[in-house]
Each structure stands twice: as structure tokens, then as C-alpha cells.
Amino acid sequence: YYELDKEFQKKYWIELSEKIKNSYKNRTIFPKPSLLFNAFNSTHLNDVKVVIIGQDPYHGQGQANGLSFSVNEGITIPPSLLNIFKELNSDLNIPISKTGNLQPWANQGVLLLNTILTVEKDNANSHKNLGWEIFTKKVIEVISLKLENIVFILWGKQANYINDIIDSSKHHIISSVHPLSLIHI
């Protein structure tokens, strides 16, 4: 992701970084700082095959691990992820996972990216409009430009704002409601 190096010099990033540093000092913010860029550390640019775009990290204690929709071993599977597993089971007969840890997906080339990379404890969408959207939009632009035949899965209204920056002549785009909205019988 060296193509993003220039982003870290831009005004929005400097302002965003300052806001995030202050938030970590004064509030409980997820994920913890060491996991903030886990999506990028887990799935290198040249290995990306699928990009799943979510909203923001889980805001419950111990849930967010820096991968969209993922939680660590031993954490109860959140309803949105359980709905994803149920859809995979219903459509493809894939057994419902006992763990919500999606690190194996990331290791296989699935970039699990939220449009907003941080959130305040128990306050969903609390870091919306701080500047993360500018950064994640740039990430998608780089992937769309540099790679080919990537499957982009856009879940929820917040994720769909990037639809227009993906080159649909080179990539595949799947848009749907947020998995939390899915109803299973």
C-alpha cells in the first residue's frame, strides 16, 4: 500500500490523526491502536482478491480487531456476522462457523475494510465524518486502479458511497443491505 504514503502528508490525514490521538487519550476507542491497520497488515495489496466494505468497527468491549465484521476467538459472534454465516450456509451450504474470527479470510486475500476505522465504545458511527471516509475512498481508488478482477462487496448505505469510484469494467461489484438488516427464519 505504498501508493497511500502521500495520503499521510495531506491536511485531512494530519487533522484526522490528531483527532484520533486525542480520542484514544480521552475515551475508550476501538480497535486498540495496534490493530488500527490490521486489515492492511493482514491482506497485502498484491494479494487482494475480494474487498468487503463495512461501516465502522464493532463498538462493544473486546469485539473490534481491525478486520471488518470480524471478532477474535472466544468473542460471541455479532448478529451481523452471524447473518453473513447464515447466508453462506443458505446459498452455498457452507457450515456456520463456530468462531467470528475472519483472519483466515484475510490470509486468503479478502480485504476486510470498514469505511471508518475507529469508533467510540458503545457509540456506533461516532467517528463518521472525521476523515476516515477520505482515506478509505483513496484505498479503494488505488485497488481499482492497480488491480483487476477484484470482487467488491459493499454492505450498507455507508459502504455504497464508493460504488462510483470502482472501475466496473475491470471489477465486479456486489451491493446489498447491511448484514444486520438481513432477516432469517
Walk through the language-model features, giving the residues of each.
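Generic N-terminal amphipathic, Lys/Arg-enriched alpha-helix
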Residues: Y1-L4
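A polyanion-binding, active-site-adjacent surface
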Residues: K6-L154, Q158-Y161, I166-S168, H172-V177
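Extended, histidine- and acidic-residue-enriched regions that form the cofactor-binding/catalytic faces
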Residues: P179-S181
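Conserved small/polar residues in nucleotide/adenosyl-binding loops
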Residues: I183-I185
